Each structure stands twice: as structure tokens, then as C-alpha cells.
A protein has these predicted regions:
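Alpha-helical segments in soluble extracytoplasmic regions
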Residues: 2-59
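Solvent-exposed, amphipathic alpha-helical segments
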Residues: 13-16, 20-30, 74-88, 100-103
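Short, charged, amphipathic alpha-helical segments
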Residues: 38-46, 68-76, 95-104
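Long, amphipathic, charge-rich alpha-helical segments that form helical bundles/coiled-coils
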Residues: 47-91
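C-terminal amphipathic alpha-helix
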Residues: 80-119
Length: 119
């Protein structure tokens, strides 16, 4: 497979998962029943897994060492926030989920901005 095409696919999946995560806010800030909390947690973990794989590929193929380091730091911050969000969803505390979701969304926006091609 063409490496450039693979990276384009990774970036496309990253943007798609990011859009889905950013649109989950309403699902996360309302009081849900037990089954819904479990589904939200599973969906969050699934998206996190896809993002981990694709971000790993994009970062490892980054030609600029500074860019690689910056993306790694932002990705680590994002995954830390998603872990915190996952714990908050498990606790089923809406106020904690709101706070963790906001942190996760901010970290994701920073990561997406850094992924944009340099101009």
C-alpha cells in the first residue's frame, strides 16, 4: 500500500473519530440509565482505540523531529484526558463527566490543530 495513501486514511479516520467524540457531549452531560452509560463507555473506548492506532502511525511517520515530539505530547495529553473521561463515565457522575469531557474536547482540538499540515 502506498504510504502516503495510508497516512491520508489515518488522518481521515482521526478527523472522523474526533468529530464523533466532539458530538458526544449531549450523550455525556445528561443522566443516563445503566445500559446507556455502558454503551457510552464502550463507544468512547472504541474511538480511543482507533485514534491511538492512527495517531501512532501518523506520529511515527512524521519527518520532522520537532513535529513528532509536539504531536506525541499532545496525543499523550489527549489520551490522559480520555482515560479520565472513561473513569468519570464509569463513576456515572454527570458533573465529573462534564468537567472531564471539556478537558478531553480541548485536548482533542489542540491535537487536531497540530495535525493540520504546516502552511
Amino acid at each position: 500500500m502506498d504510504e502516503g495513501m495510508e497516512l491520508k486514511g489515518c488522518v481521515c479516520r482521526i478527523k472522523s473519530c474526533a468529530g464523533q467524540l466532539l458530538s458526544m457531549e449531549e450523550d455525556l452531560v445528561t443522566d443516563l440509565d445503566d445500559d446507556s452509560w455502558d454503551l457510552v463507555w464502550r463507544d468512547l473506548r472504541l474511538k480511543e482505540t482507533f485514534l491511538y492506532i492512527d495517531l501512532s502511525r501518523v506520529i511515527s511517520r512524521s519527518e520532522n523531529d520537532e513535529r513528532r515530539k509536539a504531536l506525541t505530547l499532545l496525543a499523550n495529553k489527549f489520551f490522559y484526558c480520555t482515560d479520565e473521561l472513561g473513569d468519570a463515565v464509569t463513576s456515572r457522575s454527570v458533573p465529573v463527566v462534564k468537567m472531564c469531557y471539556n478537558d478531553t474536547a480541548q485536548a482533542l482540538r489542540e491535537l487536531l490543530a497540530a495535525l493540520a499540515p504546516p502552511q
